[in-house]
Design a protein with these regions (language model features):
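Helix-loop-strand module that forms the ligand-binding subsite of alpha/beta enzymes
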Residues: 2-75
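Glycine-rich phosphate/pyrophosphate-binding loop and the adjoining helix
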Residues: 69-126
Length: 126
């Protein structure tokens, strides 16, 4: 799994918001990818250095509710923020993020959330 990650030019990660954070399965994957000496290291001065290289990272985030910026529940969103921190730890500081939210708030909200996500996908560079 680690070598596949290191060899990849582009990595797309599905990130569902479960109880304000990521799933245990995604956490297990992160634990296998954040490996000292392989994807990060500490310099002699104690500074962190990411070793994951220059890859394109795309996070596809799904949320049943609305947790985006400006939402009353935004402070409870710890999936996208966690993934940004974990990827930054290995030197991948600018993931592209597609968010579908409001998916559990009824058919109209779901359709709007999916349409917004599709627009974000369409705007990604090829």
């Amino acid at each position: 799994m680690l070598q596949e990650f290191l060899d990849a030019d582009t990595v797309v990660i599905g990130v569902a918001l479960y109880n304000f954070t990521i799933s245990t399965q995604l956490k297990a994957w992160i634990d296998r990818v954040l490996v000292a000496g392989k994807t990060f290291r500490y310099t002699a001065e104690g500074a962190l250095e990411g070793l994951a290289g220059n890859k394109r990272m795309i996070l596809a985030v799904a949320r049943g509710g609305r947790y985006g910026e400006g939402s009353p529940t935004a402070a409870l969103e710890h999936a996208e923020t966690y993934m940004r921190a974990a990827l930054g730890f290995v030197g991948l500081h600018q993931p592209e993020v597609v968010v579908a939210e409001g998916l559990a708030l009824g058919p109209e909200a779901r359709a709007a959330g999916m349409a917004a996500a599709q627009a974000q996908i369409d705007a990604l560079p090829v």
